[in-house]
Amino acid sequence: RYLFVAIDRATRWVFMRTYRDQSERSSTDFLRRLKQAAPMKIKTILTDNGSQFTDRFTSKAKTPSGQHVFDLACLSLGIEHHLCPPRHPQTNGMVERFNGRISDIVNQTRFASAAELDDTLSQYLSTYNHLIPQRALKHQSPIQALKKWRSEKPELFVKRVDKQPGLDK
């Protein structure tokens, strides 16, 4: 199983899904589901240089062509696609840290099925977004931060924050 993760830099809100592979099809499906789930407008997305996101290292020019399936999906959704510099994972540090937390959970548990893994990840995601305060957010949870942002800058949002999966206070 492969985990795709998106984190809003301003509020630390997380969206994630597991897939059977790291294909272009999986990455574009993830992008479309992210766009549908996110309460805020998505202007820019930052990804690593995996072949599911870019042709940067498979094209002869060694630069992205802009014609990769993921680039075209971003374009169709009005999202600007940025790539991390090669061999510089700290650029995407929020996702790297979150993935470390997920690795800890996965490595401490034996799952009887993929469905059980998905259920555990879904429960953790809900807990993370709704209940875990973040120091960078002045000890608010990501959902609390989203609600604050929405009250101050409603033009950045496409739907109500309280329609998120999990607990709603």
Regions found by a protein language model. Give the residues of each.
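Hydrophobic (often cysteine-bearing) scaffold residues that line and stabilize catalytic clefts
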Residues: 23, 27, 66, 91, ...
